[in-house]
């Protein structure tokens, strides 16, 4: 099976969908073309433009380490001849605090990372005070030295 979307994680999902289809009695000539024609979800590795010199601009809403890692890995594999510059805005101080170590290791497939700020939403004062940009940048730099504080 050959997919339009990159990533072993999506190929794995397609194999699972194929298996479910077969268990439900569907034939290959129905299942396979649909899976091979799948172009991806809105705001997940979505190509939104190309610059004049050929840089590809993508948008991805993944904001959890379990989404970021496989997405960047897939982009790195598909565009191995290109540099990957990521702009990432963590969503919620509390989530960033809770998943700090996971976020720290999530950007190894990026060449550079810019973090503008942490998006405030329903956060408690103690989370905002504890989860500073300096702390986030410091943890990420242990695994991705090319991280920039964008605020």
Task: Write out the residue ranges for each language-model feature.
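Nucleotide phosphate-binding/pyrophosphate-handling subdomain across enzymes
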Residues: 2-112
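C-terminal helical cap/extension that packs against the catalytic core
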Residues: 56, 104-151
């Amino acid at each position: 099976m050959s997919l339009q979307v990159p990533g072993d994680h999506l190929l794995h999902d397609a194999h699972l969908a194929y298996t479910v289809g077969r268990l439900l009695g569907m034939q290959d000539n129905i299942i396979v073309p649909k899976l091979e024609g799948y172009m991806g979800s809105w705001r997940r590795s979505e190509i939104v433009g190309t610059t004049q010199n050929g840089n590809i601009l993508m948008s991805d809403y993944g904001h959890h380490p379990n989404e970021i890692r496989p997405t960047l890995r897939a982009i790195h594999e598909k565009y191995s001849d290109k540099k990957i510059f990521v702009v990432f805005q963590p969503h919620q101080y509390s989530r960033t605090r809770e998943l700090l170590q996971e976020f720290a290791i999530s950007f190894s497939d990026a060449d550079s990372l810019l973090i503008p700020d942490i998006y405030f939403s329903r956060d408690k004062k103690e989370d905002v005070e504890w989860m500073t940009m300096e702390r986030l940048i410091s943890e990420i730099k242990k695994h991705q030295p090319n991280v920039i504080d964008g605020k």
